[in-house]
Amino acid sequence: MKIILSPAKTMADPEKTMLRPEIESEIIMTRPVFEQRAQALIRLLKGFSEIELKALFKVSDAIARKTLDQINGFGETRPVPAIFAFQGAVYKALAPEAFTGESLVFCRQNLVILSALYGVLNPFDAVFAHRLDFTCKLECGANMTLRKFWTSPIHEWFDENLAADEFIVNLASDEYASLVTKGGLKARVITLAFMEKKGGVLKTVAAHSKQARGLFLRQIVQQRVTEPGMIKSFKVAGYTYDGKISQKNRWVFVLK
């Protein structure tokens, strides 16, 4: 079983990222499997000026400047293990900095972080600060969008690392999950969805859903879940499994 997670735009400051001594010894950073493809994207981005980056990413002057600095200095700063490199709402709820060494090893064996720059990341992979996501209209070649650039390599990686009778538990955002949920993989993909009632209607509230994805992943890690069916019994932060509205490959958890 593999669990997929999306990255976050907010990234850790490598100079301020300090791991507890008892877990730092457990982490030996590895190199991303698609490191060469990531380097090719960085070379492509180095051809953009600050003004062009601002338009490409639709960001402020300050963020465009920071992004340019990250691109030009890519690989020159201290890398951070992927599981500690991202700091969005999902990762705050996950709180990997509080994990035991055994929990981090479980993550290394079972968690995959999808990335628009690196393709797939192991939690222990060395990551440099960057800004890139699939909303970015970066042309990677003739009729080659960023999504097309990554679809085949990511599919091949999952097919090589998972048998047809294995599972992928999807805790990624739709932007990243669509790389694996639109078919073509040998393994079965099960998406966990989180909903709550608003005005008598079940809805997905983005901010709450992000937090729930992090909390559910934390529970999966702490309980060392290796069979997806175990997740149906989870009662986390008020969310419980609703079999009436769930589907075969989309399990819905409703906030009570």
UniProtKB/Swiss-Prot annotation:
InterPro entries in the cross-refs: YaaA
One of the GO biological process terms: response to hydroperoxide
Coiled-coil ranges from the UniProt annotation: none
A Pfam family annotated for this UniProt entry: H2O2_YaaD
Transmembrane region(s): none
GO cellular component, one term: cytosol
Signal peptide: none
UniProt similarity note: Belongs to the UPF0246 family.
UniProt protein name: UPF0246 protein HRM2_41860
